């Protein structure tokens, strides 16, 4: 015969085990989803005007295509900043490996331009609003390994919910 207290502890330990397994499954699902399939990205600031709002956007980005295909001109990508690895800016791909890119170095201060060839395994990224954007004009071409994902949809603000096309609007 089991005492009421041992029955309580048996039931409590079974429930704790069930809850722990549920939490572990949810954690594994979220880990696989965000590291291999897609993730939510937050973009704010003026560098992608008019495509994105400077006051903030929630975007859905996918990670699958970066494993199977190279980025294309016009794609909006989330990158790991070459200058500060804690930041993940969102920029548009304007040049792929082998492209010859001419750009104005600092459009606010001068008309001085520079031309570079994008090296193999790199992309040239730029904000849509070039007068206020830190991008490949500042830190050079970005290696494929720093691309975190490709932006597919704007989720917030709700009035602009929908897919983001490959070219500026």
Swiss-Prot record:
Coiled coil (residue ranges): none
Compartmental location: Mitochondrion inner membrane
Listed EC numbers: 3.4.21.-
Keywords for the protein's UniProt record, in alphabetical order: Hydrolase, Membrane, Mitochondrion, Mitochondrion inner membrane
Gene3D superfamilies, per database record: Umud Fragment, subunit A
Similarity-based family: Belongs to the peptidase S26 family. IMP1 subfamily.
Role noted for this protein: Catalyzes the removal of transit peptides required for the targeting of proteins from the mitochondrial matrix, across the inner membrane, into the inter-membrane space.
Oligomer and partners: Heterodimer of 2 subunits, IMP1A/B and IMP12.
Identification of the protein by name: Mitochondrial ATP-independent inner membrane protease subunit 1b
Organism of provenance: Arabidopsis thaliana
């Amino acid at each position: 015969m089991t005492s009421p207290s041992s029955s309580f502890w048996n039931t409590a330990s079974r429930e704790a085990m069930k809850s722990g397994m549920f939490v572990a499954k949810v954690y594994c699902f979220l880990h696989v989803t965000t590291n291999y399939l897609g993730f939510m990205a937050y973009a704010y600031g003026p560098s992608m005007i008019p495509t994105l709002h400077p006051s903030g956007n929630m975007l859905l980005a996918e990670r699958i295509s970066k494993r199977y295909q190279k980025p294309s001109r016009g794609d909006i990508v989330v990158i790991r900043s070459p200058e500060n690895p804690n930041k993940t800016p969102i920029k548009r791909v304007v040049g792929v490996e082998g492209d010859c890119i001419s750009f104005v170095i600092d459009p606010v201060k001068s008309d001085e331009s520079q031309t570079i060839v994008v090296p193999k395994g790199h992309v040239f990224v730029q904000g849509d609003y070039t007068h206020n954007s830190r991008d490949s004009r500042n830190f050079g071409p970005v290696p494929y390994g720093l691309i975190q994902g490709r932006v597919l949809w704007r989720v917030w603000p709700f009035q602009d919910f929908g897919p983001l096309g490959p070219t500026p609007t």
